[in-house]
């Protein structure tokens, strides 16, 4: 079996990381400015992060949210206090695509609508609804067309305000 061809690959085999650098299999060092998948904003192999992850992995690596998990409750409490939104609910998920997918569903539940504004050249993930609001026809399959999407130019605030005010009665949300 081979890996699915998702992106054209750079000819770099990254084998380790430390701090803000990654290293390839030839020993070359690169400043890691990647801002995509599963970004580790504390840097690679940060000692505190490694210590806490190792401790947790030695206790329980994962379990369903269908049972009480005091760590999740503690996290929600801390985030609520730190953000000033302690009367909100925290929905823990796995990825940005899943976050986008569920934000679209929550907006649709709330508005009862299914038309969304997204922005040109955007990428929101590979789940079905996230693909539908991604401005890349190459990855949108017929099954993804479950709601209408209008693409507007990124950073054209006037066009966005005009469209959203004119179409407010039709819109589920603006991504």
Spell out what each predicted region is.
Residues 29-113:
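Glycine-rich loop-to-alpha-helix module at the N-terminal edge of alpha/beta enzyme cores
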Residues 77-162:
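PLP-dependent aspartate aminotransferase-fold enzymes
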Residues 174-175:
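Hydrophobic alpha-helical segments, chiefly the membrane-spanning helices
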């Amino acid at each position: 079996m081979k890996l699915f061809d998702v992106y054209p690959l750079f000819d770099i085999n990254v084998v380790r990381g430390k701090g803000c650098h990654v290293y390839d299999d030839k020993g070359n060092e690169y400043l890691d400015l990647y801002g995509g998948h599963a970004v580790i904003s504390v840097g690679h192999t940060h000692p505190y992060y490694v210590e806490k992850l190792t401790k947790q992995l030695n206790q329980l690596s994962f379990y369903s949210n269908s049972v009480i998990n005091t760590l999740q409750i503690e996290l929600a409490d801390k985030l609520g206090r730190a953000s000033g939104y302690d009367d909100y609910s925290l929905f823990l998920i796995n990825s940005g695509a899943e976050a986008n997918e569920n934000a679209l569903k929550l907006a649709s539940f709330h508005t009862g609508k299914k038309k969304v504004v997204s922005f040109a050249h955007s990428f929101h993930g590979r789940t079905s609804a996230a693909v539908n609001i991604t401005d890349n026809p190459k990855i949108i399959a017929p099954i993804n067309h479950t709601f209408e999407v209008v693409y507007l130019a990124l950073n054209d605030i006037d066009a966005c305000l005009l469209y959203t005010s004119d179409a407010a009665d039709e819109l589920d949300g603006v991504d």
